[in-house]
Amino acid sequence: MYLQELLKGIQVEKIIGNMDIDIEDIYFDSRFVTQKSLFICIEGFKTTGSLYINEAIQRGAVAILSEKEIAIEGTTTIKVENSRKALAAVASRFYKFPTNTLKLVGVTGTNGKTSITYMVKSILGYYNINVGLIGTISNWIGNKEIEAVRTTPESLELQKILNEMVEQKVDTCVMEVSSHALELGRVDHTKFTMGIFTNLTPEHLDFHEDMDHYRNAKKKLFYKTTLCNIINVDDIHGKMIAEELKEEQIPLITFGMNQQADVYATDLKINLKGVSFQLHMGQDSKEFHVKIPGLFTVYNAMPSILICYILGLSLEEISIALEAMKGVPGRFEVVEEIQRNSVIIDYAHTPDALENILISTRKFAPKRIITVFGCGGDRDKTKRRIMGEISGKYSDYSIITSDNPRTEEPLKIIEMIEDGIKQVTDQYKIMIDRRCAIEYAMKIAEEKDIIILAGKGHEKTQVIGNEVFYFDDREVALEIARKEGLI
């Protein structure tokens, strides 16, 4: 595509050089630049793309787009006000505006995004509908799995994936949309058929400053939709968003446990094997069963059912497919091989998520709940004390350990968690090494105790300092169980 065509619709402040050149690819990472490509300099948090212009040119870039005015002999340079926004616009055009063709469902909120996207993929896939998924665990183009680097890909990668979905005849893509992606413009120039709001609890406040900024970032999704939005109004922030959207006459459907919602659930039954509930939608009512325990499962199932219903499936069809679903990796995942007591792997790494899983487990726990958890380093520090209080309040015994300490001192993170837990209980132990913490939990657990390994879920790495080590909670639990003769 010619550079002049590629830059249509972008506010260009200055161009130096020839615009009549053919661009064969686009990059923002100089390490991957190829011949006849456009290199876009992204202003990052740790470095800036303009430092890598020479490398990009050496590798074959024929044009440079930057927020800085640069003159380079033999290379076309383009100055723009915001290179991230320009990247999104250029990427969408280069990959032929894939969301003009593809049905795209965006799911945003602090918790529940992964579970909802997997539920929708599972339900639609049950009826052989070609489905795409973009999210935290992995990306899927039909039956092809692609590794996910972040919850929502950078705009260039996103448009490339969406374009491949169109080429592979994918009917619908369901996608996790993070607040970072919305705030940083990764989903600019992307049309969503539907937008889903799950809930909002303190998270990423190191980035968003406060809850108002966090909510406003999430709300941006609902102005990008072409059909409707589905909002959880049991959540105070969801209720605020719904009221604002109604005032602006933006189509939406509300859901919750409250019968004032457009769609609501009653007659909940929750145990270790799953949940059942009655869903009420207008004049229709239907019982649903899901093999994932917890109240949060009902909150995840309701929008999933609505999405699939709007996309054309009947409630009966959805019910059959949802009951057949086995679960979501690292989301209340019971390690079935261990029988003496229940070991549950969950991604709960926010105060709300940890509280939800502990309260849900308490409702059917026959004996003690032993929780192994930590908090990530180089991330929001305000949640550490809160999570300590929550584990202390709802667990019978807690083991505070490491969870991706990154460049922070692990013990310092643990001490901040301890500040919270010691306010409510003395039933806890500190063990910096996560493997040792899991082993200790399994050694002290008695028959029918429930061990919750919280925070990492599907993750298969532990980040300590600047090094990444292989670590899988599930595999570690199984290794210890075999060693202790529990399998």
From Swiss-Prot:
Pathway: Cell wall biogenesis; peptidoglycan biosynthesis. GO terms for molecular function: ATP binding; magnesium ion binding; UDP-N-acetylmuramoylalanyl-D-glutamate-2,6-diaminopimelate ligase activity. It is found in: Cytoplasm. ATP binds at residues 109-115. GO terms for biological process: cell division; cell wall organization; peptidoglycan biosynthetic process; regulation of cell shape. Carboxylation is probably crucial for Mg(2+) binding and, consequently, for the gamma-phosphate positioning of ATP. It is an enzyme of class 6 (ligase). InterPro entries: Mur-like_cat_sf, Mur_ligase_C, Mur_ligase_C_dom_sf, Mur_ligase_cen, Mur_ligase_N, MurE/MurF_N, UDP-N-AcMur-Glu-dNH2Pim_ligase. It catalyses: UDP-N-acetyl-alpha-D-muramoyl-L-alanyl-D-glutamate + meso-2,6-diaminopimelate + ATP = UDP-N-acetyl-alpha-D-muramoyl-L-alanyl-gamma-D-glutamyl-meso-2,6-diaminopimelate + ADP + phosphate + H(+). A motif (Meso-diaminopimelate recognition motif) lies at residues 403-406. The modification N6-carboxylysine is found at residue 218. Its EC number is 6.3.2.13. Gene3D superfamilies: Mur ligase, C-terminal domain, Mur-like, catalytic domain, MurE/MurF, N-terminal domain. Its cofactor is Mg(2+). UDP-N-acetyl-alpha-D-muramoyl-L-alanyl-D-glutamate binds at residues 30, 151-152, 178, 186. Pfam families: Mur_ligase (PF01225), Mur_ligase_C (PF02875), Mur_ligase_M (PF08245). Keywords: ATP-binding, Cell cycle, Cell division, Cell shape, Cell wall biogenesis/degradation, Cytoplasm, Ligase, Magnesium, Nucleotide-binding, Peptidoglycan synthesis. Meso-2,6-diaminopimelate binds at residues 379, 403-406, 455, 459. GO terms for cellular component: cytoplasm. PANTHER family: MUR LIGASE FAMILY MEMBER, UDP-N-ACETYLMURAMOYL-L-ALANYL-D-GLUTAMATE--2,6-DIAMINOPIMELATE LIGASE MURE HOMOLOG, CHLOROPLASTIC. Catalyzes the addition of meso-diaminopimelic acid to the nucleotide precursor UDP-N-acetylmuramoyl-L-alanyl-D-glutamate (UMAG) in the biosynthesis of bacterial cell-wall peptidoglycan. HAMAP family: MurE. Belongs to the MurCDEF family. MurE subfamily. This is UDP-N-acetylmuramoyl-L-alanyl-D-glutamate--2,6-diaminopimelate ligase. It comes from Alkaliphilus oremlandii (strain OhILAs) (Clostridium oremlandii (strain OhILAs)). The gene is murE.
